[in-house]
Amino acid sequence: MKVPDTRHRHISHLYALCPGAQITKRQTPGLYNAAIKSLDLRGDGTTSWSRAWYMNCRARFYQPEKAYEIFTHLIDLQTFPNMFDAHRAMKKGSDEPLSWQMFQIDGNFGAPAAIAEMLLQSHVRLPDGSYEIELLPALPKVWANGKVTGLRARGGFEIDIEWKGGKLTNATLKSVSGEKAVIRYKEKVVTYPCPTGKSLHLDDELNNHKLTL
């Protein structure tokens, strides 16, 4: 297939991957691998908004180091001192910016969304209608130790996660909908009932030690 411009920043053809959820690793592997190839051909974006979208896609591809590399480019090259996103187009094939630049909010929205995707994903919908909640799917090495609180997952869950040495140590999932919780960490998947207002307290093996208010 001829590709007329392999370096173009637009990736509308990958909408079904991200922010959509029709293309996933386990449900549509053929399309998923094709999406990876397509993004590899495009590089890492040029404008700030495209880098943010690419960063989200790399998180969906389970490529934490690539996602983090794009993030550092956003911060170092395309962010004003006041942390506003700088719509600073780069010269083709390089990280050297063109002379003009302006504020564009897309990067300010897209980069935090990508960080959340690196720590938690819940876009995969299972045949019974429930969502699979995946913990730390794209954690980069530089974030070896940390915690995050208050992330929201599809299916109606509020989630806190802690990790050390690049590995999950514990997680808490609070239900706001009463739906069952389907949780994945790496290759392990568990399912727990979780009534509205209750919280699951999981260890590093996804064992639930208590159900609390």
Which sequence ranges carry the predicted segments?
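Conserved short loop/turn motifs at secondary-structure junctions
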Residues: 51-60, 89, 99-101
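A near-ubiquitous, low-amplitude feature marking generic local secondary-structure context
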Residues: 2, 37-38, 50, 94, ...
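Aromatic- and histidine-enriched alpha-helix N-cap/loop-to-helix transition segments
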Residues: 10-14, 46-52, 62, 103-110
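Extended glycan-interaction surfaces of carbohydrate-active proteins
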Residues: 1-48, 69-87
